[in-house]
Amino acid sequence: MRTHYCGHLNKSLAGQTVELCGWVNRRRDLGGLIFIDMRDREGIVQVVVDPDMADAYAVASQLRNEFCIKLTGEVRTRPESQVNKEMATGEVEILAKGLEIINRSDVLPLDFNQKNSEEQRLKYRYLDLRRPEMSDRIKLRAKASSFVRRFLDDNGFLDIETPVLTKATPEGARDYLVPSRVHKGSFYALPQSPQLFKQLLMMSGFDRYYQIVKCFRDEDLRADRQPEFTQIDIETSFMTSDQVRAVTEKMVREMWLELLNVDLGEFPVMPFSEAIRRFGSDKPDLRNPLELVDVADLVKDVDFKVFSGPANDEKGRVAVIRVPGGAELTRKQIDEYTGFVNIYGAKGLAWMKVNDRAAGMEGIQSPVAKFLSEDVINGILERTQAESGDIILFGADKANIVAEALGALRLKLGKDLGLTKEGTWAPLWVVDFPMFEEDDEGNLHAMHHPFTSPLGLTAEELKANPAPAISNAYDMVLNGYEVGGGSVRIHNAEMQAAVFDILGIDADEQKLKFGFLLDALKFGTPPHAGLAFGLDRLVMLLCGTENIRDVIAFPKTTAAACLMTDAPSVANPAALEELAIAVTVAKEKSAE
């Protein structure tokens, strides 16, 4: 039906007759001529309809926004004075010769010329996607997916599909369950990742695997999470963690170069412990110059228990952030930041303004200065390299609370005060994660997943002292977002059973949930390692937006609902009966 896309027309086609299909973006009547901005997925071009073309003019007179039309016309260059530099096709226009209405449109429930609510946009997503901004994002996503496939194909990886209906295994989040009609009372689980299947593919000898795959997690949502998301899943045999990081870093660097013409440069590598110490986060945004500085040794002997208590607690921490120019913050602003850190469990936010460094104690303004000696204050000023006009903000509590609260405050201050270098890129690798993390009851949980290999330990050594073990894991971080994470996997049954034991998974449960994996590990399993990228998050960064819903064609809300299709919905009673499922929600509600 068409010979060209609207957005592809240029001066080289002047004089040629073209056929276009698309939508009326805008229609204007000017001095007898009708002008139509015609739009398709590739862009917009101006169409001129002259009254001399009677049939086309009669049709053009009926057009309204979002009518679907077909146009036949001649490409002509615009006079220099009429060139529209705001349009990619602004040097040309189409003189209409034939015009056909393919389909009319009702008045839209969305106004493309103003900001619509997200609820309206999601309810009428098929209309929202017509907006050039949204169309460009979805096209960039397609280019990113195409690039990934091309890169991995060229590097010897095989695209292999893994099951979607599978077995529930503990991977950190709740599973989406699918009832079996054939095996009544039993359920499949939708995969949170293809983790075990890709490891089994390595045991099958496929060496290098990849898949762009849907994954499902029933977890609390936020701006950069969805119940169903897309993963670039990668696994390799006979490659070290350094080699896996090298090939995946190369992929991301070449992707940014091809799609954005940006050279990310070589990624620095930072141990987990350093990331937490300096930035309070295992995914630090290095565009932000603010850092956490430990001062526990300076305040451990002061009479102020708010500081000395955590400073002398092996699980405590006292750290500060020096904010350049922060002495200008008002008391109201400081109170607002205090309320902000309260969200993360901090009990307060002590502060110290350095109004005049040269004036000694006279130049210091702080509600806690009276509890600190001049030597302690000078020690803090020297360690933080504070200057006149700065403010120092304190965190003193359990180490995890201090890291989380000051880490979040660091990001907020960076944005609020314009310290974060927007429009730049700061990638890095975070490595050497703890193997386990401890809950409030003292139980150990896998920080990544239970198939991650420890670094430099035998099974016996790990079982003897598991808490301080370091895992052979690595995360790729970009501008404060974890865009990919992976590890070297456990490749022998003894080590895997040891990890399960440490996590409190007894022998019977191991056999029930992971018997197939433990069996497979007995048959000459190769060393293997891998990594998975969140495609949605990568594309979100490529597009310069902060919400992955902006780069998914048909996303869910933060309540995991689809406003367009009204999913999830109540199931047909006959279908539930066939599945031997009884719904108790209504009974529970009536009982309340």
From Swiss-Prot:
Subcellular localization(s) per the UniProt record: Cytoplasm
Catalytic reaction annotation: tRNA(Asp) + L-aspartate + ATP = L-aspartyl-tRNA(Asp) + AMP + diphosphate
Alphabetized InterPro entries for the sequence: Aa-tRNA-synt_II (IPR004364), aa-tRNA-synth_II (IPR006195), aa-tRNA-synth_II/BPL/LPL (IPR045864), Asp-tRNA-ligase_1 (IPR004524), Asp-tRNA-ligase_1_N (IPR047089), Asp/Asn-tRNA-synth_IIb (IPR002312), AspRS_core (IPR047090), GAD-like_sf (IPR004115)
Biological processes annotated in GO: aspartyl-tRNA aminoacylation
Residues that hold ATP according to the record: R217, D218, E219, Q226, E482, G534, L535, D536, R537
Source organism, top-level taxon: Bacteria
Keyword Transmembrane part of the UniProt annotation: no
Keywords: Aminoacyl-tRNA synthetase, ATP-binding, Cytoplasm, Ligase, Nucleotide-binding, Protein biosynthesis
Principal place of residence: cytoplasm
Enzyme category, top tier: ligase
Sites where the protein binds L-aspartate: E171, R217, H448, R489
PROSITE patterns: AA_TRNA_LIGASE_II
Organism: Vibrio vulnificus (strain CMCP6)
CDD domains: AspRS_core (cd00777), EcAspRS_like_N (cd04317)
Single GO MF descriptor: ATP binding
Similarity field: Belongs to the class-II aminoacyl-tRNA synthetase family. Type 1 subfamily.
One GO cellular component, as annotated: cytoplasm
EC number(s) on file: 6.1.1.12
PANTHER family (alphabetical): ASPARTATE--TRNA LIGASE, MITOCHONDRIAL, ASPARTYL/LYSYL-TRNA SYNTHETASE
Purpose of the protein: Catalyzes the attachment of L-aspartate to tRNA(Asp) in a two-step reaction: L-aspartate is first activated by ATP to form Asp-AMP and then transferred to the acceptor end of tRNA(Asp).
Protein name: Aspartate--tRNA ligase
Subunit structure: Homodimer.
Annotated gene: aspS
Chain positions covered by the region annotation Aspartate: 195-198
Signal peptide feature range: none
